[in-house]
Curated annotation (Swiss-Prot):
PANTHER family: PRENYLATED RAB ACCEPTOR 1-RELATED, PRENYLATED RAB ACCEPTOR PROTEIN 1. The lineage of its organism: Eukaryota, Fungi, Fungi incertae sedis, Microsporidia, Unikaryonidae. It is a multi-pass membrane protein. This is Uncharacterized membrane protein ECU02_1470. The keyword Isomerase does not apply. Keywords: Membrane, Transmembrane, Transmembrane helix. It comes from Encephalitozoon cuniculi (strain GB-M1). The chain crosses the membrane at residues 54-71, 75-92, 104-121, 125-147. It is found in: Membrane. GO terms for cellular component: Golgi apparatus; membrane. It holds the Pfam family PRA1.
Length: 156
């Protein structure tokens, strides 16, 4: 139980840091800092530094794109419901007809439900994978191109 409370406090602190520092948000949207990396090592360094510094912004961008796509393809709400029901049943272990559901049974039922969903709604899943790939490409491109000002952070 202690671990859960500690994780919640850490999560809240991270959210406050991400939202409280206006310089980070300004740096994220500052197109004046965009420049092509000199070599592959410079690109890797930038990507790792920017992914660490702007993780909340990249996560928010991905969540917004995904939410827009879910609103466009409403059948994905069924998938969200299947996953949510599976997580709930796995954690709570409800009783159905005087039989307690085991985690193994819940995982198998969830897998079968998701598989059936994939069979009937192929286009929605392909679109979701395309959105994921697009977000990954945009994130890595932004992280690799955003360069100036990183030297100040590295020296501190």
């Amino acid at each position: 139980m202690q671990g859960g409370i500690q994780e919640e406090k850490t999560f809240q602190r991270n959210i406050k840091e991400a939202l409280g520092d206006k310089d980070v948000t300004r740096d994220f949207f500052n197109i004046g800092r965009i420049c092509v990396p000199q070599n592959l090592n410079d690109a890797k360094r930038r990507v790792f530094a920017n992914l660490d510094r702007f993780k909340f912004h990249y996560l928010a961008m991905t969540a917004i794109f995904t939410l827009i796509y879910v609103l466009y393809r409403l059948e994905l709400i069924i998938l969200i419901g299947i996953v949510a029901a599976g997580v709930y049943a796995y954690r709570v272990r409800p009783t159905v007809c005087n039989i307690e559901l085991e985690p193994r049974s819940v995982c198998i039922a969830g897998f079968v439900g998701i598989l059936i969903f994939f069979i009937f709604f192929k286009e929605a899943i392909v679109g979701l994978l395309a959105i994921s790939a697009l977000c990954g490409i945009v994130t890595l491109t932004h992280a690799a191109l955003l360069g100036e000002g990183l030297q100040k952070d590295d020296e501190v």
